[in-house]
Amino acid sequence: MDRSVPDPLPRSAPRTPAMQPAGSAGKRRFMKMFHAHSKNDFVRIKNHKFLPLHICQSRKTKGKAPLPPAETKGTDVSSAEDPVESTAVVTEQQDNMIDKDIELSVVLPGDILKSTTVHGSKPMMDLLVFLCAQYHLNPSSHTIDLLSAEENLIKFKPNTPIGMLDVEKVILKPKSLDKKKPTPIIPEKTVRVVINFKKTQKTIVRVSPHAPLQDLAPIICSKCEFDPLHTVLLKDYQAQEPLDLTKSLNDLGLRELYAMDISRESCQISHNPDIVKEKENKGIFSFFQRSKKKREQTASAPATPLVSKHRPSFTRSNTISKPYISNTLPSDAPKKRRAPLPPMPTSQGAAQGQERRASCVERSTSVDDTDKSSSEAIMVRTGSLQLSSTSIGTSSLKRTKRKAPAPPSKTPLAQTDERNSAMAHGLPLEDGIAPDSMLELSSPEGMSTPEGSLGPGFLSQEQCAVPKPPDEISEGPGTPETAVASLTSGVSSDYSLEEIDEKEELSEASKDPAGSISVKSPDIASASTDMRITVEKDPDSALGISDGETSPSSKGKTQEGRSTEGQGPYHPVVGHIGNEDRVSDSIKDMKTLGPNQESVVQNEIMVCATSTDYVKNRPGKMETTIEGEGEALKKASDMETDRLSGSPACRMDNVKSSRENHLTASPGPDQKLNQPGVEKTKMQDAAIQATPARGTFDGNHEVSNSSDPRADETVQTSDGSISAQHSSASLQDSVNASREFRSQGTSTYVQDRLPEKEPACTYGNNVPLSPVDGSNKNPAASYLKNFPLYRQDSNPKPKPSNEITREYIPKIGMTTYKIVPPKSLEMAKDWESEAMGRKDDQKMLPVGQRHTIENMTETSMQTEVPATSKSSQQPQPDLKPKPSSGTERHLHRTLSSPTGTETNPPKAPRVTTDTGTIPFAPNLEDINNILESKFRSRASNPQAKPSSFFLQMQKRASGHYVTSAAAKSVHTAPGPAPKEPTIKEVQRDPQLSPEQHPSSLSERTHSAPLPNISKADDDIIQKPAETSPPPVAPKPMTLRAETSPPPVFPKPMTLPAETSPPPVFPKPMTLPAETSLPLVFPKPMTLRAETSPPPVAAKPVALPGSQGTSLNLKTLKTFGAPRPYSSSGPSPFALAVVKRSQSFSKACPESASEGSSALPPAATQDEKTHTVNKPTVGSQHGDGDKQNNPVQNEHSSQVLTPADGPSFTLKRQSSLTFQSSDPEHVRQSLLTAIRSGEAAAKLKRVTVPSNTISVNGKSGLSQSMSIDAQDSR
């Protein structure tokens, strides 16, 4: 064996056999493990033939890892050769021990000796748990000690089997707590006790509330550093009786004590501080010491009580707000202010002269200290300002220092100007900060006194309020206002930071125009507040907008300026009245100022970028408006509003706002004069703000914008509404429609589209919108002019707002795919041709139909019908914008609402879903037009499939759909019952039936088509050859034929004339009595269930009637959508229908004689299936067949036209009518067929293979239909 070798690769395959001598079972077991590892390693080595040797050795090391885990008792692994043999021996012994039960003696905690038997394979942890459970001990609090036969402790691991250890005795003992931390002792409840000592000192001690005071005394004394022998505990300083030391704090109910040191020294010491304090209180230094204490106590407050208490002697006479404002400065500033105080007389009762001298000293010191810190100077200035009223020179110094912290400005000029202004006003302005602009404005008016006017006078007061002595302040409006004025005036350094920033802005803005303002330029430069005031009051009042425009330059601020009417946004305290007075005064001043005013306006323009455009032009305009007074303003505002908003709503808003502005500003005649300017300027502001957004207003059109922001908004919103309103019959309707559109968000479609093109019309000219005024003679034309362009532009890239709802509206039977530009082009072409046909057809539409169409709002076709009615009323170009049902729908919403179908827009959304259930049936002509446009759009969109979400409801399995139709008919059973007689009546008098039975869907559908048919019969017959096929075929066939026309729907695409597929109904209509009702019913039946036609007779027919119109195209297309349900063979339902139709035809000898018998039941079935198939085919092959279908339809219509023989169709339909007369019977048959489930599927399946095949663009179905029709004839 190779064991003597170092064995670099002990696990290699060749060595494995050598390493397996016939040994003990333990050794064999070990070798098995070893061999397994060596195998794995060998495979690895084999796979990696070029591994270096050290890697193999490392693998060897890994192989040894699984050596026996237990440390056997007597084993000594000393040499490299012994491990295998020794381990094998130990393993064998352990195996023997593990496999047998072991007798153990167990020593329980009370030295109780027990014996137990345990299997050798039980791990030690399990043994502990087992023994503890056996003897009812807690294993978590006990441990196991193992003793060998020699009474030696055996070390073990928790998972070591007991059999592997030579155990004689097991000791269960509680875990020793010595090694662990002692269990935490529950802390004693303690409370915080406040210990007062030495009168003014406090400390806090936490003690037990239950311990007697005598136990707490040492703790308290140590805390207070008293001698426990000389310490007495009192309730408080006043109490002379010591507390009972035997009682606890809880007994006494105390949480605060007073510790008194009764020793003589401590008493003396305690008295001395009191005396010293009392003396200090009388002296000057007491102030500082107090201030220090209080500052320590109130370190968090920036303002120290020192300033507040020490200053009142000076400041009470002056504005009280000053010292407090100054207190807001950093805490270090007060310290510097205190420096000059020591020289002051010690007595607080010193004369004011002394105080003023002191103030002068402070002033000088502050001047000296200005270099040290601007805050210091500010502090001194504030103090000196209060005292500075006496001397002008000092005031100038103060002013200079005051201005230093202010935004950069021309201080000397400002000072001189301020002094001049103060002199002019005769106001004792200590600060000398009367705004020159105020002087100019107020002085011409002779308003030198603050009482003269709240405007400039008040401003001067405000500015001077801070420096003024109390007398002048008393004259002022009040300290709070003066404080506000001081803030606004910027005279003192105490004004708020916001004002400082604003002043800086104003001063900077005014620097450039300052030169033009001879006297004002210094004011503006030096005191931004003056500029502010002038801007806020005079210029603003004169301009009326400057307040809102200059500082805010935003609508919110402009609104604020408007509400205040010249009131400075920074003088809210002054009040509206004061502002208005100031406005009037400032207007007068502006008049007097003339060029100055203009310069001020220019300055304001600098401030407000928004108003610059017309602020420049404003002075002249304002003067004219002021001269023209309120009337001119009203006229102007009215003119502007008229221009802006053709709709009365906008006018009303504009006029309203202008009048409100007049009222607000009209307190006095001056205000009226000012107000026109203000209003006009405000209107201009609004216009300017609005114009950039629209970019359609002309330069002259600035004024035309609404004076009120609301009006402006209405105008903006009305842009779209106005465009929609062009098509409205009256302004009121348009306004309402626009409002409805806004509320519903439906107008966005029109707004997005129309405004783009119509803005030129609406706003491009200042001339009022004549179409909006109600001169929309051809709203559709105006709409179409822009709309086709919009379609072309927008289809490729739908606008984000319209992507979901407007721009891309799913067409009937179409999946919700984005419209591709090529489609739009094709659609436009189709629509043009379609429009031509529709124009002719629409011309033929009776007025009654139009009204009925308007009333169709409840119909699922509401949106579509109104659109078609409009198209009928309007030139066909309308159809171009309507290429897609989505567009039609939106147009219908936007346009129909203007046309008086305002109720439609809200209802429009449900149009597609409710198609089958709506009580009102739109005229077939209109529906056909709509459907044609939609299906043509589909034709143009070959990818479009009849899966628009609107038709999801209609995309059910044909059987399911029929079920729904039958159910609906059941629900509308009252309707169907009347419909049956109505059907008969209609057959007798088809044209009357529509009017007589407008309520019933089928009848209504027929009635609508009948008038249309009467006029559009020729077109319908020719184009809606589709309709003719229904009459030709037996009722089932008629249904099939009608169904086939749905495939013809493409033809509606080609036939610009109203939706030829609906004409299918009209064609029955055309066969006035005959097809009108029966065909319509059957067709809906065919459309819905394809096999439903026979049941159509009753309620199903009625539902299809309403649906039929909508379904002519919609449902047929949608039926095409559920292709998986198409059936290839006549389903039981179809057979039942055929049988029923045959039975009816037999029942009616007329139909049989006319040739219903000519078509055998099989033929009828075939035709039925074919016709049904054709609708499916049409829907499926709509793209390809649509082009073919027109021809096919024409052919079928030609063939069917003879088949239209009124007698035959009437009889066939009369049989249908008879069926409908027995609604329950029909319903049962329908239900049975539907339940079979195979009927619809088979029908459609058959449809696809049999009829879908198109020969030369003509579907076999239509040809077969025509042949069948001819045969039947």
From Swiss-Prot:
Coiled-coil regions listed: none
- Residue stretches of biased makeup (Polar residues): 314-330, 383-397, 485-495, 702-750, 763-779, 860-876, 894-904, 993-1002, 1187-1200
Superkingdom, according to UniProt?
A: Eukaryota
Name all WH2 domain ranges. Answer: 1226-1246
Query: What does the entry state regarding organ or tissue expression?
Result: Detected in embryonic first branchial arc, branchial clefts and limb buds.
- Entry-annotated residues carrying Phosphothreonine: 183, 304, 328
**Name of the featured protein:** Cordon-bleu protein-like 1
Q: Where is the composition biased (Acidic residues)?
A: 496-505
Ranges of compositional bias, category Basic and acidic residues? 354-374, 631-643, 653-662
Q: Which GO terms describe its molecular function?
A: actin monomer binding
What positions does the record give for the motif labelled KKRRAP 1?
Answer: 335-340
- Residues annotated as carrying Phosphoserine in the record are 248, 266, 300, 317, 366, 373-374, 384, 396, 518, 521, 541, 546, 551, 554, 645, 666, 770, 869, 896-897, 993, 999, 1028, 1092, 1214-1215, 1266
